[in-house]
C-alpha cells in the first residue's frame, strides 16, 4: 500500500480541482459542453478511480500540461509516503477503494486522506489554472472555433437541418 497511497489524493481530489480549472477557463460558449465532459470525468475519477476519461480529454490537446499533471502525481505520492499514509486498492484509487482499504490491517493514518485531498484539490486547481492561462493551453472548451461550429444550436427543433449536419460530418450519403 505504500506506493499505491499517493494515487488517492490525486484521483479523488486533484482531478476534480484540475477539472474545475478547465471549466472556469473554457470559453463561455463551450462551458456547458466542458462541464459535461470534464465534470463527468472528475466524478468518475472521484468515485471509481478511473482517470482515463479525464486524462484523454487534455493529454493530446495540451501535452505540456500532462507532464505537469504527472509531476503533481509524483509530488503527492512522495508526500503520502513521508506522512505515513498507507492504503492499498483492488481496482483503483477512488472512493470505493478508499472506504474498503481503510479497514485493511495494513492501512495506516487513513484520515490523513481528507487534509491531503483538500491540499491536492487546491494545488491541482491553482497549477492548472495558472498553466492554462499563462501558456494559453488548448484544454477542453478552449480549442479554436471551427468554421460553422458557432451556427449549430443543440436546442434546435429543425431536425432535418440537424440530420443534414450530422450526415455531412459522417462524410455524406456515399460514406454510410
Residue map of PLM features:
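Residue-level signature of catalytic and energy-coupling elements of molecular machines
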Residues: 49, 175-176
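Structural signature of hydrophobic alpha-helical transmembrane segments
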Residues: 4-12
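Short linear motifs at secondary-structure transitions and domain/linker junctions
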Residues: 20, 33-34, 44-45, 163-166
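Membrane-proximal intracellular helices of multi-pass ion channels
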Residues: 28-37
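A broadly tuned "polar low-complexity/structure-edge" signature
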Residues: 36-41, 176
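Structured cytosolic domains appended to multi-pass membrane proteins
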Residues: 157-175
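Transmembrane alpha-helical segments and their short flanking loops
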Residues: 1-3, 15-24, 40-41, 47-156
Amino acid at each position: 500500500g505504500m506506493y499505491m497511497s499517493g494515487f488517492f489524493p490525486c484521483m479523488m481530489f486533484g482531478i476534480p480541482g484540475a477539472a474545475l480549472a478547465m471549466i472556469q477557463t473554457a470559453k463561455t460558449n463551450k462551458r456547458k459542453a466542458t462541464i459535461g465532459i470534464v465534470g463527468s470525468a472528475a466524478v468518475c475519477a472521484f468515485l471509481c478511480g478511473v482517470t482515463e476519461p479525464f486524462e484523454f480529454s487534455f493529454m493530446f490537446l495540451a501535452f505540456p500540461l500532462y507532464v505537469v499533471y504527472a509531476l503533481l502525481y509524483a509530488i503527492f505520492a512522495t508526500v503520502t509516503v513521508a506522512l505515513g499514509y498507507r492504503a492499498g486498492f483492488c481496482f483503483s484509487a477512488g472512493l470505493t477503494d478508499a472506504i474498503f482499504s481503510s479497514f485493511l490491517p495494513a492501512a495506516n493514518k487513513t484520515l490523513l486522506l481528507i487534509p491531503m485531498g483538500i491540499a491536492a484539490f487546491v494545488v491541482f486547481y491553482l497549477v492548472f489554472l495558472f498553466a492554462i492561462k499563462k501558456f494559453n493551453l488548448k484544454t477542453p472548451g478552449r480549442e479554436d472555433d471551427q468554421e460553422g461550429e458557432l451556427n449549430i444550436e443543440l436546442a434546435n427543433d429543425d431536425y432535418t437541418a440537424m440530420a443534414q449536419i450530422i450526415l455531412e460530418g459522417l462524410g455524406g450519403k456515399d460514406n454510410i
